[in-house]
Regions:
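Short, basic/aromatic recognition patches that contact phosphate-bearing ligands
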Residues: 1-66
């Protein structure tokens, strides 16, 4: 596993922290697009979902809208 893949959950957390609030959200597709564009990380919907679940397990409050 390369360093970018290891950092992916942190990049997701950073995006959510900087770009979302009660009135603004990011979709998984938008997160995937930004990971590719900004960090050169190609990933799947399931992987991003797993990253979000892991961040929630750490106690980071992330609201998921189905």
């Amino acid at each position: 596993m390369n360093i970018k893949a290891k950092l992916r959950p942190f990049y997701v957390a950073k995006m959510l922290y900087e770009q979302t609030d009660e009135d603004h959200y990011l979709t998984i597709a938008q997160i995937m697009e930004q990971l590719e564009k900004e960090y050169g990380i190609s990933t799947s919907r399931g992987t991003v979902g797993d990253d979000i679940k892991a961040l929630q397990e750490l106690g980071i409050e992330i609201e998921v809208i189905p």
